Amino acid sequence: MSKPVDHVKRPMNAFMVWSRAQRRKMAQENPKMHNSEISKRLGAEWKLLSEAEKRPFIDEAKRLRAMHMKEHPDYKYRPRRKPKTLLKKDKFAFPVPYGLGAVAEHEPPHGLKAAALHGGAAGGLGPDSLLGNPEKAAAAAAAAAARVFFPQSAAAAAAAAAAAAAGGPYSLLDLGSKMAEISSSSSAGSALPYASSLGYPGAGGAGAFHGAAAAAAAAAAAAGGHTHSHPSPGNPGYMIPCNCSAWPGPGLQPPLAYILLPGMGKPQLDPYPAAYAAAL
């Protein structure tokens, strides 16, 4: 950008007075040397000069400053504004959706990274080991999901089971059985805080619903065989995916249905919510 015609230069200081002749001399001796390199060398040489050697240049700078003040009494130094720093190339100038930044940087998704940090901490599973072993990554992700759906004690057991099962070649198969055990223990444990607000008959049904869903998902991912659905024991409107055989085993309770006729009393154990029975 060209300077205006009425631009007034600053008065030279002692270093500028000394380096004016030295710069010209050094540029003639080294025609290929860049101006910035010349300035560095001149600055180093100026610092090596003694006070007696600098004194004539200091006096000359004072004389030039006094002359400058007489010629331009209204002069005021106005430094140039520095240009605003541009955004870095590796930063996004717009909001990035969740997980997109990791894909752009060739990193694992944040969900897998969080599962590696939290779920694998108990069993000594680091992020590097999870990236190199898909089975350990799946076990850590299942343990992270268990902390969301199960109570605290069951979540700790799920994390321990996932860490223990991650070392063997059949880790996913073992994880399915471990999740089934955890689901049964969580259904008999403490009640979930949101079970009653959703109209479930008790905390056991809600815990069994979440436990069966997690166990079925883990088993289906491991085996990949025949899958079908069972009615939820807590709410018959929901179907739980299952990976067991086509015929239910003796341990599974078959779905029950009650027909209410006039004159008949309500059964003592009602597995369905009152609203669903009224709809029948």
Swiss-Prot record:
GO terms for cellular component: nucleus. One of its GO terms (molecular function) is DNA-binding transcription activator activity, RNA polymerase II-specific. Expressed predominantly in CNS. GO terms for biological process: brain development; inner ear development; inner ear morphogenesis; negative regulation of DNA-templated transcription; negative regulation of transcription by RNA polymerase II; neuron differentiation; positive regulation of transcription by RNA polymerase II; regulation of cell differentiation. Its main location: nucleus. Residues 8-76 bind DNA. CDD domains: HMG-box_SoxB (cd01388). Keywords: DNA-binding, Nucleus, Repressor, Transcription, Transcription regulation. It is found in: Nucleus. Gene3D superfamilies: High mobility group box domain. Transmembrane segments: none annotated. InterPro entries: HMG_box_dom, HMG_box_dom_sf, SOX_fam, SRY-related_HMG-box_TF-like. Acts as a negative regulator of transcription. This is Transcription factor SOX-21. The gene is SOX21.
